């Protein structure tokens, strides 16, 4: 009897749990419908109807979004108390971040510095950072710390917005500002060829430094004349000015720059770094100008261990163009240790060894690279006839970890926006959350997005998390039926089609590029109309281009005829 009672109770519990789960799911569906209704009312500025809907959405993850829309619709007339209340409750959201940023600009314009300080959180905007510093300086809050923060913003070769001028004025009139700092910013500005910035800073120099600055500015404007009439004695600053002129001259008169270098390097004590900088720039200028002797200048750079991606990339590219394997081998020897471990440089080093008769050593490197799931790993595998390695290792996590991510407010908001087809809001909510998640949380989120069919977020988030071995997330076989049908119809390789889709749209079926290309395979409207005419019908609008089957079939057909 007891056993029967236990079975009945167990069965009832299962039924109850199933019914509860169904009711909760049904409740969420009803909430989405009510939220859509509220959005329509918000678009019509019917805020009374919005409030009525909101009363039914108290535990819905996006209920706050209706408050946000109401506030933004009448921002200038919204009380500070209402804004503060929203930020206190929903400040940790994409909308909260946007509202905070908008309010900070308004408060700065009104010079409401104490309220500005109250709501400020770290911002990327230099303007808002400068306003923050100004607010602290005016109110006397942590004055010295504020001045040092201003110094960090000020010390750059770039121009800064006028919003920074009040804070900079405090800096110029403080003990934090020194002649050494002024000279350093002039150096940074001249290095970037920002003459106007350097001249503006130079106005704050005492008279004894003005001549130094004037020499540099004159050299910048007319390097050839200045180099012909250079009279400064040998100091570090004089050598800086000379090198600036030589770099400027090399762009327009390469031979004259070389001649002046040969003259001045015998009379001035340039250090190793200055030698390196001169030859590095000369080499890059020679390549840009397409000079026939560019390989000579690339080889002349004293580049051992130099961390300069552009130089190394240019050297390898030129060596490959000229099939100069000996030069390529020498270039590899100059790489910093971390770059020598790069799959790309290792592969080309092995190719150079192979061409120079060192096949045994080359094979060792190719075999090592062939074990990797990487473009150069696959190229290496081809060299030694080894199979490609996919190395699919899905992100591992517990059920509890997965549930914690799924129930996190960041993810709940993004998911609801996604289900409502509000993709811009969904991506914004997702991006906000991913910036704040750890790498492991991001990797779990990527798998979650993949499970939902939100393929592009899965791809981008897995890459951000460094989950490179989670292959089915990074390379999903999405829209398989449509893509396979199109590939068969147009006699196009299926793998090639998937590669194009992933590269062009990351499986975003409604994506539109800056150039106007649409859909999975990024079809231009003009091309689509041409294809449509050839097939005997016209396109009323671009909506048909976004249809997955149409987009895939037409683009595959175009490539098939190429």
How should each PLM-predicted stretch be described?
Residues 1-9:
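Bacterial N-terminal signal peptides that target proteins for export
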Residues 25-34, 45-46, 58-65, 77-79, ...:
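Generic helix N-cap/helix-start motif at coil->alpha-helix transitions
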Residues 40, 69, 73, 106, ...:
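Residue-level signature for tetratricopeptide repeat
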Residues 44, 73, 77, 106, ...:
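Structural motif corresponding to the intra-repeat A-B loop/turn of tetratricopeptide repeats
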Residues 48-53, 78-89, 112-122, 143-155, ...:
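Alpha-helical repeat scaffolds
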